[in-house]
Amino acid sequence: MAAGAILKTTATLTVITTLIILGTGLFYMLSGQGHRFDIGWFLTSTSPHMWAGLGIGFSLSLSVLGAGWGIFTTGSSILGGGVKAPRIRTKNLVSIIFCEAVAIFGIIMAFVFVGKLAEFRREDLPDTEDGMAILARNLASGYMIFGGGLTVGLSNLVCGLAVGIVGSGAAIADAANPALFVKILIIEIFASAIGLFGMIIGIVQTNKASFGNK
């Protein structure tokens, strides 16, 4: 119930925010003031470190959210099933470990992204083509880390949910029939691979990210 309510609330807020942005853009465009809704100006005027910081934050926070949600889902089933079948408590801790690995993926990638940061001062750039090229490279690096952080965070969020739900089913099935545990564990391993895929894509996305005034 709680998980469903959180998902519905998140979806509602996302839809409302999207409609507000679209409505504002359409209003300015249809009223002849489209220049006031300049997304390009916003993207090029903001600091690339801001985008990189947001990417790092999303990578860590969404991964921890997915891990916590998965542990909550699995843990409640293990505790409930363990009342009638105490033998399931120990071996079903594997599901908890899989969920915890999701958070570890996010932490590792956050450190990888932080390692790519370096000092960059826009005002020190020369007003030449080389200066514009350096600015473009730093802006692109910020966007890369932002996109990589979103990729890792969302992948780990979905991975944590999948592992938690499958782990919950594994605990209940194991309590009823011990022969089912290994079969469901295979499904859980494939579910946990989603987070690994997100890590790999995040590394590929940020492979060429480079900050600095040179």
Swiss-Prot record:
Transmembrane segment boundaries: 10-30, 52-72, 94-114, 145-165, 184-204
Any one Pfam family match given in the protein's UniProt record, by short name: ATP-synt_C
Topology of the protein relative to the lipid bilayer: Multi-pass membrane protein
Deletion consequences: RNAi-mediated knockdown causes embryonic lethality. Causes defects in alae formation in the few surviving larvae and impairs yolk uptake by the oocytes from the pseudoceolomic cavities. Causes an increase in the section of the excretory canal, which often has multiple lumens and abnormal whorls.
GO biological process, one term: embryo development ending in birth or egg hatching
Lumenal topological domain: 1-9, 73-93, 166-183
Sample GO molecular function, one term: proton transmembrane transporter activity
A cellular component term, taken from the record's GO annotations: proton-transporting two-sector ATPase complex, proton-transporting domain
Keyword hit for Metal-binding: no
Disulfide partners: none
Site (described: Essential for proton translocation): E100
Localization annotation: Membrane
SUPFAM superfamilies: F1F0 ATP synthase subunit C
Known tissue expression: Expressed in the H-shaped excretory cell, rectum, and a pair of cells posterior to the anus.
Keywords, in A-Z order: Hydrogen ion transport, Ion transport, Membrane, Transmembrane, Transmembrane helix, Transport
Ranges in the topological domain labelled Cytoplasmic: 31-51, 115-144, 205-214
Family according to the record: Belongs to the V-ATPase proteolipid subunit family.
The protein's assembly and partners: V-ATPase is a heteromultimeric enzyme made up of two complexes: the ATP-hydrolytic V1 complex and the proton translocation V0 complex. The V1 complex consists of three catalytic AB heterodimers that form a heterohexamer, three peripheral stalks each consisting of EG heterodimers, one central rotor including subunits D and F, and the regulatory subunits C and H. The proton translocation complex V0 consists of the proton transport subunit a, a ring of proteolipid subunits c9c'', rotary subunit d, subunits e and f, and the accessory subunits vah-19/Ac45 and vah-20/PRR.
Job of this protein: Proton-conducting pore forming subunit of the V0 complex of vacuolar(H+)-ATPase (V-ATPase), a multisubunit enzyme composed of a peripheral complex (V1) that hydrolyzes ATP and a membrane integral complex (V0) that translocates protons. V-ATPase is responsible for acidifying and maintaining the pH of intracellular compartments and in some cell types, is targeted to the plasma membrane, where it is responsible for acidifying the extracellular environment. The V-ATPase is required for the function of the excretory canal. Involved in receptor-mediated endocytosis.
Protein name stated in the entry: V-type proton ATPase 21 kDa proteolipid subunit c''
Upper classification of the organism: Eukaryota, Metazoa, Ecdysozoa, Nematoda, Chromadorea
